A protein has these predicted regions:
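Adenine nucleotide-associated cytosolic modules
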Residues: 1-164
Length: 164
């Protein structure tokens, strides 16, 4: 809500909708132009991925823990050649220990950097009619080494979300 207010102060001619409801597979996202995932738990990420794919929405996902962060733009619902989140990070039946921010800690500047990268990609998605989307790549930021790597992602042809 605060972000909506601040953005509206800067530009009163824009329309921003926020969603403060708990997200589940029945959530209605069809009226949103872009979906931003800033969550820190896998189940939410899988749900957002599924909803974005089914509703043909661009999903701009950011994650961070300790001194590392990652950014990905997912467009599997808009282009069948692109992978989705679950192609790259498949669900497993085995319960593996997951490190989250609360347990592992996080450097504040890392979240700021990844968030800024997400916003930058969102602006390009909305404002530029001809631009080379970064969909299909995973960007890995290492705050300790001060490096950014770009990895080309491959679609899983047996993915239960986007290869059905």
């Amino acid at each position: 809500e605060n972000l909506v207010k601040e953005c509206s102060k800067i530009n009163p001619n824009i329309s921003i909708k926020s969603n403060n409801k708990k997200l589940d597979q029945s959530s209605d996202i069809k009226n949103f132009d872009l979906i931003f995932d800033c969550s820190d738990n896998p189940e939410t990420k899988y749900t957002i991925n599924l909803l974005s794919h089914l509703n043909k929405k661009t999903l701009i996902s950011g994650s961070a823990v300790q001194m590392e962060g990652q950014l990905a733009i997912w467009k599997s619902g808009l282009n069948t050649d692109y992978p989705c989140y679950e192609c790259v990070f498949p669900k497993t039946k085995e319960v593996a220990p997951i490190t989250n921010c609360r347990e592992a800690g996080i450097m504040g500047p890392i979240t700021g950097l990844i968030g800024s990268m997400q916003v930058n990609e969102g602006i390009k998605e909305i404002a530029l009619t001809t631009y080379d989307s970064r969909a299909g790549y995973l960007f890995l930021y290492d705050g300790l080494a001060q490096s950014l790597d770009k990895i080309k992602l491959i679609k899983n042809r047996k993915c239960p979300v986007c290869s059905i």
